[in-house]
């Protein structure tokens, strides 16, 4: 079990304040805990996950009292809550089964990000979304050939804060080839479906990735990657 904490804040002297502006100095406290549990010497069953909580002040210059009273001097001194404050969580979990001496693997995962989970440490992180996925991974020919079947579902706006809810489901196959005389090869074939009240989007995606290392001399080498996409 691991515990992690982080504090983000904007420097007041680097932000010019104007009445009616849209951007204000912010601060955020982030705490998370992740874990991993395995059963058996060969780790036949593995369970891992992480949960994180975020307390965010969207305007540190807001001097109004919060709508809730926590009656805690520690909270008042360190978190300094006000009417711009919010709290939300994010979590992920993965249940993994290692079968037939690890040659076959079944993975079932889930990722959840609350609508208010926004902070500078994870810029661009999609929020208000719940994702579930399942994968079957099969190793063949001494791990030189790997086949992966996958199914992914995703739903946003579970908080009903958005005007439109978009559902996505995806299924496909990955083929990985790892032979010493040939480039490392991955072929991915996916079917992606998006649907909401305004439109329905369906596409087939084929991706080819080639990776080859070249030894130029005893002390130097080169790596070449070729990636092609068709949809």
Give the label of every model feature segment:
Residues 20:
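Substrate-binding cleft/loops of secretory-pathway carbohydrate-active enzymes
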């Amino acid at each position: 079990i691991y515990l992690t904490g982080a504090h983000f804040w904007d420097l007041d002297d680097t932000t010019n304040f104007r009445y009616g502006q849209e951007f204000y100095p912010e601060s955020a406290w982030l705490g998370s805990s992740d874990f991993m549990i395995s059963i058996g010497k060969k780790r036949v069953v593995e369970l891992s996950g992480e949960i994180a909580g975020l307390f965010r002040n969207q305007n540190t210059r807001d001097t109004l009292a919060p709508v809730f009273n926590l009656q805690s001097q520690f909270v008042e001194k360190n978190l300094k809550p006000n009417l711009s404050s919010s709290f939300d969580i994010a979590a992920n979990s993965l249940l993994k089964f290692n079968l037939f001496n690890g040659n076959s693997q079944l993975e079932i995962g889930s990722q959840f990000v609350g609508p208010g989970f926004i902070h500078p440490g994870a810029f661009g992180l999609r929020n208000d979304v719940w994702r579930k996925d399942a994968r079957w991974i099969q190793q063949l020919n001494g791990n030189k050939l790997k086949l992966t079947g996958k199914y992914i579902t995703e739903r946003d706006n579970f908080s009903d804060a958005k005007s439109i809810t978009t559902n996505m489901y995806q299924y496909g196959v990955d083929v990985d080839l790892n032979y010493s005389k040939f480039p490392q090869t991955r072929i991915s074939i996916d079917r992606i479906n998006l649907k909401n009240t305004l439109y329905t989007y369906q596409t087939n995606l084929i991706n080819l990735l080639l990776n080859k290392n070249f030894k130029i001399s005893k002390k130097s080498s080169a790596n070449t990657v070729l990636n092609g996409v068709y949809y």
